[in-house]
């Protein structure tokens, strides 16, 4: 049983469904794309939920898109995290060949071992220009890649949903890219045969199906096929009721964000209500009229309310007035530790180190030193933060652009962000210095830096290797001297050391 028979048996194909393998005639046996033998059986979306809607599927969630947007703006910790990630991603929004540190994006061949031809280089530069301008030509009225990427990164960190429209040319290729408010994009209503049979989404061709709609004020204002709108989520799930939407970090942090707002409000009330209001005023043994009580309340508020009244001592002329303090400790809620805990939880969910948003982590939620990933210092913590949070976000954006844009032009090329692991000039010099003393020659290092070779530069500056070469040269010189002495003794000619011939002639 050969490989293809085993593959057919594993796939459960009937004998009449088996096909002979087809190969290309390029000299290498390359298996061509095969057609599926049966339709998908699984259901990935709830058909009833889609058809009971107003032509689109609403995301079932406790928080609306508008609430998620307000949370990302009004909570300072979440806002700082999102803004930090947006700024970090924006540093990769220009071609890497334009920057000195090599940070940016590049278009290269998908096969890393292939050497590009001149035609492929020209096509890569054309694709690079298209991505940079978000279109074939420069248009100041259209978003460039920096603006586009800032918009979609903010959307994906807020809603776990990004989208941009792909305006096609006459050949069906991308001509322009326009960012779309992700909060207005919904999945279109699924098609059902005869009102009974469920149709798997993969069984419907994208060019024939309206896959996405834009909803504004509850009304559908635009419709898009799968090739006209890019849609991506970072946290996909198999839940039938959720498909095809993702899971936003803010949905996970509802309780923590609310607690943080309450804690800030609790502390800010000190300035709005004064510092001596956490107690009870008791007028003992007096029948105070409503008018007198209101007058006393106005006097008390005038003296203590606002930032100017904080921690002031009230002076009143009321007999039998007693103040009962109900705040026995200024650490009754462990305010600082509680705030530190909430900030750390928010940063953990967003996969970012608190120090990146200017909140130093003192080792844990309690603010005491302790073991953890940050023991190696700030550089180790930042590197760990980049590996956990920034790198996956960059890879996600790469996959979206490759899927919806680059692959529409050619399968030969791929879009990549580069420079995340780039070193500084000092680090590069230190690395080159170590390499030239271990396994690289001087001329090899000079070639990497676009410098011409130097005479006698094909040597590794390792002391052991250098001593070995020197000893070898000395042995060869000594052997040559012995051979010359033997030849001169046989011929009777006196061997004169180099440099002494002129002195003998002068005499």
UniProtKB/Swiss-Prot annotation:
GO MF entry, a single one:
DNA binding
InterPro entries, sorted: Phage/GTA_portal
Q: Please tell me where this protein is predominantly located.
A: virion
Q: Where is this region: Disordered?
A: 1-44, 476-507
Q: Where is the composition biased (Basic and acidic residues)?
A: 30-44
A single cellular component GO annotation: viral capsid
> Which GO biological-process labels does this protein carry?
symbiont genome ejection through host cell envelope, contractile tail mechanism
Where does the protein end up? Virion
Ligase in keyword set: no
Reading the lineage from the top rank, the first entry is Viruses
Q: What keyword terms does UniProt attach to this protein? A: Capsid protein, DNA-binding, Viral capsid assembly, Viral contractile tail ejection system, Viral genome ejection through host cell envelope, Viral genome packaging, Viral penetration into host cytoplasm, Viral release from host cell, Virion, Virus entry into host cell
Q: List the disulfide bonds.
A: none
- Protein family: Belongs to the phage portal family.
Fill in the subunit field for this protein: Homododecamer.
Function of the protein? Forms the portal vertex of the capsid. This portal plays critical roles in head assembly, genome packaging, neck/tail attachment, and genome ejection. The portal protein multimerizes as a single ring-shaped homododecamer arranged around a central channel. Binds to the terminase subunits to form the packaging machine.
Question: What is this protein's record name?
Answer: Probable portal protein
